[in-house]
């Protein structure tokens, strides 16, 4: 009995011990847990395309500098004491060097180019030096132009201080020597223009000489036949090109079949659109997009129903020249100091009218101060949007870059 009692007591102790052991379990080692962040794939931020050289230049320009690029002036216009009659007088002394006061005026009116007349030229060395002065005086190098058509209008070849080849007239060259002669004329003229520092020539004459009563064109034109005129015009332009000179085809929409002198009044061409396409416009179709076309103060009432000069006509500059004929080069006005303009419009009206028509470059305003201020004010008050100004200036800058007038 004692043995049984002892065994019973031992079992009881064993159970109690087991129960106590369950109340104090051995801790279990587990691996530490870490919070892992999974990267989320996101699209890279959109990047702006890099600016072109012309856009970089534009982005650093002041408003005055932008407006200035629109103007090609005679250097005499920098002498603000002179009026239009003084500047235009061929017998008065012209500006032949860039003096201190003229350099100061350029800071106020940082123009895009200059055109030199005979009164601005005394001899070969002076001309070379003067063009260099004009080029170096501006942060954005200017167009340096003259009228060297060959024949009657030749500022250098007809100057007594120069011994240069002379041509009787484009009409005579075309009739006698054909396209080869026109090309050689362009090469010769372009060669000496480049030598003296020019980069642009207001030539060739792209008018078709169809009206014997025309007082200003005549044999300045290559031919009375539009097909021949177109071929000869292209040949001369190629010669200028090969000499490093920018050709300017003039005077769109055609000055050949007019009886008026646009220096004095608006010239009128009475032809219909179909007639113009078959004649006057053929030579202008030869102009390429790296070249220029000069628009004349010529009205086409059969197309526009008005006597508005083409220079101020959106339907002719933008509608016909840009859109219908597809020309994408620079469009420059004829002189805004001519009677066709000054008798009917103020300098500011003429400048803004030409820009609104679609012209890029404003040639020789009657009054630089008034024309410049008119454009500047119109941009500042929003009547001529700055975005439109930027578009025009960008075209000018690209053109100067293409022709290595400025560096990228």
Question: What are these model-predicted stretches?
Answer:
Residues 318-331, 335:
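Catalytic PLP-binding core of fold-type I/II PLP enzymes
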Residues 1-24:
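Sec-dependent N-terminal signal peptides of Gram-positive bacterial secreted proteins and lipoproteins
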Residues 76-96, 104-229, 251, 256-270, ...:
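Enzymes and membrane/adaptor proteins characterized by extended Gly/Ser/Thr/Asp/Glu-rich
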Residues 232-235, 239-249, 275-290:
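Phosphate/pyrophosphate-binding betaalpha-module
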Residues 136-141, 240-244, 323-328, 382-385:
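Short helix-capping segments at alpha-helix termini
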Residues 20-104, 314, 323-324, 342-408:
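Preference for extracellular/luminal or secreted protein segments
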Residues 100-105, 201, 279-289, 317-323:
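Structured alpha-helical segments in the cores of large, soluble enzyme domains
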């Amino acid at each position: 009995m004692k043995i049984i009692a002892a065994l019973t007591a031992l079992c009881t102790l064993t159970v109690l011990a087991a129960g106590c052991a369950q109340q104090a379990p051995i801790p279990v080692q587990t691996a530490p847990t870490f919070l892992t962040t999974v990267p989320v794939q996101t699209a890279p931020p959109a990047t702006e395309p890099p600016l072109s050289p012309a856009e970089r230049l534009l982005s650093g320009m002041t408003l005055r500098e932008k407006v200035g690029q629109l103007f090609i002036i005679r250097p005499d216009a920098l002498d603000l004491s002179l009026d239009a009659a003084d500047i235009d007088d061929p017998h008065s002394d012209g500006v032949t060097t860039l003096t201190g006061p003229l350099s100061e005026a350029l800071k106020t009116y940082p123009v895009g180019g200059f055109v030199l007349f005979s009164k601005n030229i005394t001899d070969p060395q002076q001309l070379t030096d003067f063009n260099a002065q004009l080029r170096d005086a501006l942060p954005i190098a200017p167009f340096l132009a003259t009228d060297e058509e060959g024949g009657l209008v030749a500022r250098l070849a007809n100057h007594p201080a120069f011994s240069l080849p002379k041509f009787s007239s484009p009409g005579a060259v075309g009739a006698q020597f054909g396209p080869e002669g026109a090309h050689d004329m362009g090469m010769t003229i372009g060669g000496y223009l480049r030598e003296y520092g020019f980069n642009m020539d207001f030539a060739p004459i792209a008018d078709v000489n169809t009206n014997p009563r025309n007082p200003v064109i005549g044999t300045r034109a290559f031919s009375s036949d539009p097909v021949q005129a177109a071929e000869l015009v292209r040949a001369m332009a190629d010669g200028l090109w090969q000499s490093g000179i920018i050709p300017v085809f003039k005077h769109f929409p055609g000055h050949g079949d007019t009886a008026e002198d646009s220096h004095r009044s608006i010239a009128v061409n009475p032809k219909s659109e179909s007639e113009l396409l078959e004649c006057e416009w053929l030579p202008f179709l030869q102009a390429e997009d790296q070249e220029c076309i000069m628009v004349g103060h010529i009205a086409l009432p059969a197309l526009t129903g008005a006597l508005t000069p083409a220079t101020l006509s959106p339907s002719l500059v933008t509608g016909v020249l840009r859109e219908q004929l597809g020309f994408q080069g620079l469009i420059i006005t004829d002189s805004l100091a001519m009677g066709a303009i000054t008798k009917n419009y103020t300098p500011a009206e003429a400048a803004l009218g030409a820009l609104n028509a679609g012209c890029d470059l404003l040639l020789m305003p009657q009054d630089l101060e008034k024309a410049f201020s008119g454009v500047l004010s119109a941009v500042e008050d929003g009547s001529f949007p700055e975005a439109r100004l930027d578009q025009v200036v960008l075209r000018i800058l690209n053109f100067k870059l293409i022709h290595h007038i400025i560096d990228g």
